[in-house]
Amino acid sequence: MQETCFYFNSNTSGSMIDYEGDQYTHHDDYFITSGSGQNQVVGNNAASLFCNMGPLFTCKTYFNSGYSGDSFKTLGGKRVNLPTWLKNNNASSESYYSGGCSGPGC
């Protein structure tokens, strides 16, 4: 399965939402599983993520909606806390085949 899973709390804990594919905005979606943050808007509320894909894929999280602004890349298969500047400031995301990523989070 190719998913980007965002979590309300750090260390991939609390309520979660899983996205298959790109999300132009996180502001129309809600954390759905039981736990801290359930039914809260995903936009500007995620603290961590699981890039639930193979190692040749990348999950990219953006500060702004529409895949714009500063971004953070995470290599497939990794569970990470969002960096301080992006924690609770997430607005959109995309995932793609990258052959592996380079930069922070990889």
Task: Please report, for each region that a protein language model flagged, where it lies by residue.
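Compact beta-sheet-dominated domain cores in extracellular/mature segments
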Residues: 1-106
